[in-house]
UniProtKB/Swiss-Prot annotation:
The protein, known as: CTP synthase
Pfam families linked: CTP_synth_N, GATase
Database matches in PANTHER family: CTP SYNTHASE (PTHR11550), CTP SYNTHASE-RELATED (PTHR11550:SF0)
Annotated residues for binding of UTP: S13, K188, T189, K190, P191, T192, Q193, K224
Lineage: Bacteria, Bacillati, Bacillota, Bacilli, Lactobacillales
């Protein structure tokens, strides 16, 4: 029988529910259980694919091509699993499916209502996420906070699950903020008490509290919360602020969180062996050397827009025994005159993905600087496309060369729309998304990075591609297409082999990086940057 764990939040949003859920998932996995995890987002968008990164941070893409919340990146990195389209559910997606069923007459003339039709659809998503992965345990995080109007159907579905599958198979975990008032010199429990009261008013009694706090709460605070919120004192878990997020599973384990969960759900498993994870955390906490990486991006004011890129760099730093000293460079402010000032002290330059004209010329300048000064450079997605544009302009002397996305009237469309995208008008969910194979050129930097594998599978999110009409011209000038699709139509990886490291990929390598298994192309880049340290 599958066990269901539901993680809700109160008092404030962005309290760390996703990290709590991911940490618990790691602990349960290390007990030998098969775990999956999903995020419920109560916004009306179908998915975050068309949302501005300023609104929502990065869009995380799964193997099967779902555009999802960035929390899924935390889930995959912590638990080291690959999720699917059932792992991210939004209000928009549910209502869209319910309305389509109504139009097809599948409700047989019934009045379509939130209860039971919307709640049934939500419960079906929970169960489908578990069955498609054959999981012992599924953890479901509900975005936002208790009391939000948008969350009500989701919480009602969670309430109903207890009756559907039995109380021994369901556990509710509520995360809240425990604020410390410096002037009063004490922690305040009232916000948590009121949040739990609100949750209980919706028919859900939490079995565990996770309290986010800046400093240890002490047993008296835990006892008080236990008394007023009707949970066991040992089930009040502190989520202390830490220097590194990968410490959190160890902190949770030290408070027996996973054992309490297993006891409640009647799961008999051995204790979680966190030896390897603990060794990784010890290493992370004691890195002495730093390598400086300049990230030239469009959305640098919001680091969450590049969350997976940053994490992948960190993971590759662990392999090289270095911390990443990240220098954020706003591509929109980069010019030929100031590029040396902005990136001249960097040991490596990364140009990540993005969309639109703004900042593209600044990214091209950064790529030119890296090529001309032999600074290790990694381009990703749009970064790969602009690497091709830069080479066309400055080496092949194709003046006015550009991407057709950025300049539809360019005389040299080095990057053009994919053939199967030409007649598509909708923006959402229509990109080339998900896992696709890439055939690597023997003897190339890319092949070396991937331990000389012939084919790798990586996740994509793009609509435009390299225009193969220019391929021979590029190759004649020494530009190497070191990764291509198996049918040889799509150029996936490009490089200049005479440079220290000048490689760019159409796919998103960062989406498959893990703290205990860094993504290989990122690792090769960071290794080159370390060798280039000033």
């Amino acid at each position: 029988m599958t066990k269901y764990i539901f993680v809700t939040g109160g008092v404030v949003s962005s309290i760390g529910k996703g990290i709590v859920a991911a940490s618990l998932g790691r602990l349960l996995k290390n007990r030998g259980l098969k775990v999956t995890i999903q995020k419920f987002d109560p916004y009306i968008n179908i998915d975050p694919g068309t949302m501005s990164p300023y609104q929502h941070g990065e869009v995380y893409v799964t193997d099967d091509g779902a555009e999802t919340d960035l929390d899924l990146g935390h889930y995959e990195r912590f638990i080291d699993i690959n999720l699917n389209k059932y792992s991210n559910v939004t209000t928009g997606k549910i209502y869209s499916e319910v309305l389509k069923k109504e139009r097809r007459g599948e409700y047989l003339g019934a009045t379509v209502q939130v209860i039971p039709h919307v709640t049934d659809a939500l419960k079906e998503k929970i169960k489908r996420a578990a069955t498609t992965t054959d999981s012992d345990v599924i953890i479901t995080e509900v975005g936002g906070t208790v009391g939000d109007i948008e969350s009500l159907p989701f919480l009602e579905a969670l309430r109903q699950m207890k009756a559907d599958v039995g109380s021994d198979n369901v556990m509710y975990i509520h995360t809240t903020l425990l604020p410390y008032l410096k002037a009063a010199g004490e922690m305040k429990t009232k916000p948590t008490q009121h949040s739990v009261k609100e949750l209980r008013g919706l028919g859900i009694q939490p079995n565990m509290l996770v309290i986010r706090t800046e400093q240890p709460a002490g047993q008296s605070i835990k006892n008080k919360l236990a008394q007023f919120c009707d949970v066991a004192p040992e089930a009040v878990i502190e989520s202390l602020d830490v220097d590194h997020i990968y410490q959190i599973p160890l902190n949770m384990q030290a408070q027996n969180m996973d054992q309490i969960v297993c006891d409640h759900l009647k799961l008999e498993t051995p204790a979680a062996d966190m030896t390897e994870w603990s060794a990784m955390v010890d290493k992370v906490m004691n890195l002495e050397k730093k390598v400086k990486i300049a990230l030239v991006g469009k959305y640098v004011e919001l680091p969450d827009a590049y969350l997976s890129v940053v994490e992948a760099l960190k993971h590759s730093g662990y392999v090289n025994d270095v911390a990443i000293d990240l220098k954020w460079v706003n591509a929109a402010e980069v010019t030929e005159d100031n590029i040396k000032e902005l990136v001249g002290d960097a040991d490596g330059i990364i140009v990540p993905g993005g969309f639109g004209q703004r900042g593209s010329e600044g990214k091209i300048e950064a790529i030119r600087y890296a090529r001309e000064n032999d600074v290790p450079m990694l381009g990703v997605c749009l970064g790969m496309q602009l690497t091709c544009v830069e080479f066309a302009r400055n080496v092949l002397k194709l003046h006015g060369a550009n991407s057709a996305e950025l300049d539809p009237k360019t005389p040299f469309p080095i990057i053009d729309i994919m053939r199967d995208q030409i007649d598509i008008e909708d923006m959402g969910g229509t990109l080339r998304l998900g896992l696709y194979p890439c055939k690597l050129k023997a003897g190339s930097r890319a092949a070396a990075a991937y331990n000389n594998q012939e084919v790798v599978q990586r996740r994509h999110r793009h609509r435009y591609e390299f225009n193969t009409k220019f391929r021979e011209q590029f190759e004649a000038a020494g530009f190497v297409f070191s990764g291509v699709s198996p049918d040889n139509r799509l150029m996936e990886v490009v490089e200049l082999p005479e440079k220290k490291f000048f490689v760019a990929a159409q796919y998103h390598p960062e989406l498959q990086s893990r703290p205990n298994h860094a993504e290989e192309l990122y690792t090769a880049f960071v290794t080159a940057a370390v060798e280039n340290m000033k």
